[in-house]
């Protein structure tokens, strides 16, 4: 079977799987409500299982929705938060087949140990713990046929965006779709992510409370990324810490985000909690592990200047400077009403 036929087959299978899962979930929820069993906990569990099994962009959307305060009912938000770091993983058969595809028939001989059971599963791939020369490693293995999955999901999202555009014409969904499409396809290129990891390691090398894994090139391919293992706990597990610790973690998160942006125009485009860990390797103050570098956006200096101008404009209530900032971002035909709306989003 040639590549185009294989890709088409993958897309058709994806359309069928998405339609089947979402239709089944919708029917069950509707049935529960009809017979007076509108239990949000059970319904949220149905949605979690459906989206977790789908992987790909639709799962990423669910991850994003779970991070927006008050957007979803509490039961749904809590369930979908599990997708940030604990999604369903591939079975051992698929793992072995995928590893053989990436590193060859004798792939296991390249490792001292390789745990077939995933330590973490996400939307586009899953992470396995391994060891080489007594060094602990993390191998991120992409799920099978993800390009077809992404293409199929993007087509469905495009339809949703088009429908939304007929209802609300103030938001240009075409630009959102283009940006989303480009970033998602970049995330499938693990060699690109390897370069991003090296870039962030260099940018943040002087930040003693920020840890960046080191990639292992000889054990990495376009769809397999191997790096040094970083040990830590989830970001949310530290929310009950004392104020000094929480302030320190917040400041470290700020530095991890804004030092690359303000100095180099580089932004981490997928900052959901599952992409961070906190570790207490320092006795008094913990440090932050950055784990994912697939979605990195580089902006021109004019855009960064616009961000700084807007911060000053809002701080000083300077509308003229705010208009200059919005124009630097590409906004045109700015009216008082549009500026007020932009201010709401900016603050």
What is each PLM-predicted segment?
Residues 74, 81-88, 100, 147-152, ...:
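ATP-dependent phospho-/nucleotidyl transfer catalytic cores
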């Amino acid at each position: 079977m040639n590549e185009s036929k294989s890709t088409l087959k993958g897309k058709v299978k994806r359309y069928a799987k998405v339609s089947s899962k979402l239709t089944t979930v919708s029917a069950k929820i509707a049935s529960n409500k009809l017979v007076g069993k509108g239990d949000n906990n059970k319904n949220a569990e149905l949605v979690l299982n459906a989206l977790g099994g789908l992987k790909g962009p639709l799962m990423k959307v669910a991850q994003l929705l779970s991070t927006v305060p008050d957007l979803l009912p509490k039961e749904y938000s809590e369930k979908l938060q599990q997708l940030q770091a604990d999604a369903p993983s591939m079975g051992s058969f698929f793992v072995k087949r995928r590893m053989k595809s990436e590193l060859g028939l004798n792939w296991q001989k390249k490792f001292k140990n390789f745990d077939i059971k995933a330590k973490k599963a996400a939307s586009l791939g899953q992470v396995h713990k391994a060891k080489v020369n007594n060094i602990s490693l993390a191998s991120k293995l992409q799920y099978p046929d993800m390009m077809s999955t992404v293409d199929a999901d993007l087509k469905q999202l495009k339809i949703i965006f088009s429908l939304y555009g007929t209802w609300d014409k103030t938001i240009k969904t075409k630009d959102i779709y283009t940006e989303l499409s480009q970033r998602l396809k970049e995330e499938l290129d693990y060699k690109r992510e390897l370069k991003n990891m090296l870039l962030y390691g260099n940018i943040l090398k002087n930040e003693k409370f920020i840890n960046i894994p080191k990639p292992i090139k000889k054990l990495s391919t376009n769809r397999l990324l191997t790096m040094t293992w970083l040990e830590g706990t989830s970001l949310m597990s530290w929310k009950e810490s004392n104020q000094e610790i929480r302030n320190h973690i917040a400041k470290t998160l700020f530095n991890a985000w804004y030092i690359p942006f303000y100095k180099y125009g580089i932004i981490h485009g997928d900052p959901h909690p599952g992409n961070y860990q906190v570790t207490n390797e320092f006795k008094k103050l913990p440090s932050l592990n950055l784990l994912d570098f697939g979605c990195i956006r580089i902006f021109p200096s004019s855009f960064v200047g616009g961000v700084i101008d807007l911060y000053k404009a809002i701080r000083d209530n300077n509308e003229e400077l705010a208009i200059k900032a919005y124009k630097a971002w590409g906004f045109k035909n700015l009216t008082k009403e549009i500026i007020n709306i932009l201010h709401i989003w900016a603050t």
